[in-house]
Amino acid sequence: MTTYSSREEIDEQYRWDLSSIFESDEAFLAALEEAKKLPPRFASFQGKISASAAELLAYLKLDDEAGLILTKLANYAERKSDEDTRESRYQDYSSQVMTLWVSLSSASSWFTSELLSLSEQEMEGFYSQEPELELYRRCLDVIFSRREHVLSPAEEKLLAAAGDMANQPDNIFSLLNDADLTFPDAHDAEGAAHPVTHGSYIPLMMSADRTLRESAYESLYSSYRQFRNTFAATLGAQNKQLKFFAEARRYESALEAALSANEVPTQVYTNLIETVHNNMDAMYKYVALRKELLDVDELRFSDLYVPIVDDVELTFTYEEACDIILEALRPMGENYLALVRRSLSERWIDVYETPGKRSGAYSAGGYGMHPVILLNFQGKLDDVFTLIHEMGHSIHTYLSCANQPVCYSDYVIFVAEVASTCNEALLTRYLLDHAKNERERAYFLNHFLEQFRATLYRQTMFAEFELKVAELTAQGAGITADALCGIYKELNAQYFGDGIALDENIALEWARIPHFYYRFYVYQYATGFAAAIALSQRILDLGEQGREDYLGFLKGGSSKPPIDLLRGAGVNMLSPEPVEDALKLFDEMVDEMAEACRKLKAEKH
């Protein structure tokens, strides 16, 4: 893969076009100056929206206007900064936008309390007086549904002031984990040293050299063991602040407080855990297959990342990757494909790595601009999956914005991962159907099974750990390193079964997971994955009906609660069925993998 020393070396077609946001820095700065006039306009409505339907409507229209311009300002500043993170000008632009966002939040902090001073009867009167308010009924209903959890203005101000303090467990964890923690070198079978970092750990764990894998595994956890009590204190503090805010807002639990923000019933969370518990056999079968294929006497946690199909070197040019995703997405229909082609021809995508460019990949966008995708394309299979994944987010954003008014154009995280993972599921099916030989097919199966294990099983285990720690905190129990290690080790025993050797290192894994500071976030990876598998299967099985239902979901934005949007697409996340169906597919794929590997073994002999 060609390496580039600057963006100017890259052909324009591989660099994103941000002109749909702002034509130039000058246009951005002019819009920013104009937007700085917004906070006083918000503040001027205080005391008026509860007295007049016309004033409430004017406020909501102003809120739409502000959301539009702030989204464009933030996108331009952040996208330009990500082109070269060393460029201080765009860091300054981002900082100015964030400052403005904080000012706007402060200038409008009174809104919810004042709105909730209106009775249901008064609100209905407002709808009669100003028919245009009907557009905002769902937005307002969501706020009214949380009436019992909103406090007095003085209490709200106090909770807001505590917000920065509540973020400190995450901040301390990040500094300890990312800045202060170092790891001893790992050594391979020849005795050569290999540096261990957060970035190098997984590549080392994928090495065919078992000595190196075990050394890297021991290296990583030796450092976490040294600071286990500090990590326990940060996680304990995180759970205490969640408990404090949940109780202050009169929620029954920290879980309910977190999920209510996305209108997701706690039943979805507990249902996920229960359904996975009832379908562990497929995971145990996969663990046994991995042990057999690696030909080891004892499967260890240091053996989980090494590929079980070797000798497959797949590389792709960017053009080949684009051709593959267009073919894989053919079941989505011509309208969807036309948008994908537009994204490729109209420069929505920033393709190649350059010095200073932000690492990783993402899709970003919003009302009034086309979405954009950042890649660091290296030509590996994972890069093809990344492209189709981010394309799923971008088309979701485009369709939501094209079919909803500003106030409903965004969508919550609970449904976001569905759109991206559905695309990945279609790519997996396409690759399996077009594998050139049995070895390539086994390689694709291995890729899918690992993705499945890491997403549905692993994230559900994480979700269960979060819930158990929250329940301990609610009981007033001490959150000690020993208690956390005990819970985590027991969960690993349950999720992996007898087919793997439990050790004291894996009991410490909780200490290195940043998502445990994200407030009951990880379950959405698992539910999103299950929903995506179900929807991709519907699209393949039902053809046009499945496709139209799915496109309706993508166009829905936040016009309905996420559970209702998914139900409209044909998936009921309140039932165990989507998770059960996904786990059934995993079970079938494990059998396919075993059969493919048996054929490969027979070919060798």
Regions found by a protein language model. Name each.
Residues L314-F316, I349-M369:
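Catalytic zinc-binding patch centered on the HExxH motif and its immediate surroundings
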Residues E8-I10, E23, F111, L115-L118, ...:
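C-terminal, non-catalytic "cap/extension" segments appended to globular domains
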Residues L293-P331, L337, P371, H396, ...:
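Long, K/E/R/D-enriched contiguous segments that form extended
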Residues V372-N376, N403-I413, A442-Q451, A470-L472, ...:
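Short beta-alpha connecting loops at secondary-structure transitions
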Residues M1-D311, A596, K601:
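A well-structured
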Residues L314-F316, G368-I388:
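Short pre-active-site segment immediately N-terminal to the catalytic Zn-binding motif
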Residues E327, P331-A338, A364, H393, ...:
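Conserved helix-loop functional segments at active or binding sites
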Residues F385, T397-T421:
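Post-HEXXH active-site segment of zinc metalloproteases
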